[in-house]
Every structure is written in structure tokens, then in C-alpha cells.
């Protein structure tokens, strides 16, 4: 009787684990025969490896993971090439990509936010190229310091205005708006939530929306704390 009960309990536990909601990431990577493809979580504390597969000739892959309770960010990686995407209640995300231009020439289906994240990624890539071109011209003494600084300021302003209007304030309750806040240029955050009052407003808009929808999510609390710290830093000193 005890053995039967133990078997029943184990079966029940396994059934419970298997019934937990999952999401599936599937697709193919062309021209990547023999390459390792990694699925990783982009957590607040850093990148966390989740699964991997050695790609065969057709490049097909399929990963399954527990579905997050609130929107979370993940990435596919081949060597140092990365595709970022997000998941909330989505059951399936489909991604097709060539090995050569893995990070930029991919298609993603399953959730509109992941498509928006691709748009933001491509914009950031173009911005980085434009900034690199400016730096190269300045180093070659083709631009004076004043012209270089003015040109850099214009590039950054145009980029931030575009992202603010079309991605952050347009839909602050989305994963793509959150993703936009943390984009980087030369490893520095494009939006400065600790020292720039206008940028703090962007973080505040997303923090409010996230907190309303997912009040107990770790990302909601973290974003709220960033906003509070930024407001304290930029508060006008009392006379």
C-alpha cells in the first residue's frame, strides 16, 4: 500500500510539472550546420543559460521553457551573434534567421512585441554605425571637436525623440517600451534614468504602466526604484 501511495505521489508531482504552462521557441537557422544554438534568459542580474542544441543541416530547432508570469526577455545566440525577443502569455515564438546576418536579418512571429524589439535593435545598429563613422572622421581630423560634438548630439537627440514618441510613450505598457529604455551605445545607456529629467519621465511612464499590470513583478519593482533614485538625483535643491 505504501509503495502504491509513493508511486501515485511521484506521478502526481510529475504530472503537475508537465502541466505548468510553457512557451515554445522554434524555427531554423540557415547555413549553420554544426553550430551550437543557445537559448538564454536576459535577467536583471545578467544572462542565464537555459538550453542549447547542435544545429544539423536543415538548421531547425525547438526549445520549451516555463512561461513567465509577467513579460520577460530572452535571446537566441550563435557564437557572439544574438537575437533578442520577449515572452508573456505567448505559447509559440517562431524565428527564422541566416547564420551570416543572424542578429539583423531574422524574422520573428508569435508576438508583436518581439517584432518591435527587432525594429529597435535595427535602429540601434544604425545609430552605432553612424556614431562610429563620426568617431572615425574625427580621428582622421576630418571633423573639428565642435562639429563632432554637435553632430553626435543631433544623432542622439533624433534617435531618442523617435524612440520616445513611437515606442515608449506610444505604448508604455509593452515589453518593447521596457526594452527601449535599456538600449546602449558603446556600452553606455542611451537613456539616462539617473541624471536626465526627460529620460526619467520615460522610465516613469513605463514603470507606472508595468506596476499597474504586474505590481508584484521583479522588473516592475526594479524600474520603480530606478525612477525614485533618478528623481532624488535631479531634484532642485531647496534654497
Label each region the model flagged.
Residues 127, 159-163, 203-206, 219:
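Stable alpha-helical elements in mature extracytoplasmic
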Residues 169, 176-239:
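Charged, long alpha-helical assembly modules
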Residues 156-171, 190-194:
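Amphipathic alpha-helical coiled-coil segments
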Residues 1-17:
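Sec-dependent bacterial lipoprotein signal peptides
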Amino acid at each position: 500500500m505504501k509503495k502504491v501511495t509513493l508511486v501515485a505521489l511521484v506521478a502526481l508531482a510529475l504530472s503537475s510539472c508537465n502541466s505548468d504552462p510553457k512557451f515554445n521557441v522554434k524555427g531554423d537557422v540557415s547555413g549553420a550546420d554544426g553550430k551550437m544554438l543557445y537559448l538564454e534568459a536576459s535577467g536583471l542580474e545578467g544572462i542565464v543559460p537555459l538550453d542549447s542544441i547542435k544545429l544539423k543541416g536543415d538548421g531547425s530547432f525547438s526549445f520549451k521553457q516555463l512561461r513567465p508570469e509577467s513579460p520577460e526577455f530572452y535571446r537566441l545566440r550563435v557564437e557572439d551573434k544574438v537575437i533578442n525577443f520577449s515572452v508573456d502569455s505567448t505559447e509559440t515564438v517562431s524565428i527564422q534567421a541566416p547564420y551570416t546576418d543572424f542578429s539583423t536579418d531574422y524574422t520573428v512571429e508569435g508576438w508583436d512585441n518581439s517584432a518591435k524589439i527587432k525594429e529597435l535593435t535595427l535602429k540601434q545598429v544604425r545609430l552605432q554605425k553612424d556614431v562610429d563613422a563620426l568617431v572615425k572622421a574625427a580621428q582622421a581630423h576630418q571633423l573639428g571637436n565642435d562639429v563632432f560634438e554637435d553632430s553626435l548630439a543631433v544623432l542622439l537627440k533624433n534617435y531618442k525623440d523617435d524612440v520616445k514618441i513611437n515606442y515608449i510613450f506610444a505604448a508604455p505598457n509593452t515589453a518593447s517600451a521596457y526594452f527601449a529604455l535599456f538600449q546602449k551605445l558603446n556600452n553606455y545607456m542611451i537613456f539616462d534614468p539617473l541624471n536626465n529629467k526627460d529620460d526619467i519621465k520615460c522610465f516613469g511612464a513605463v514603470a507606472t504602466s508595468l506596476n499597474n499590470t504586474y505590481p508584484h513583478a521583479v522588473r516592475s519593482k526594479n524600474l520603480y526604484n530606478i525612477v525614485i533614485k533618478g528623481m532624488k538625483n535631479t531634484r532642485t535643491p531647496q534654497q
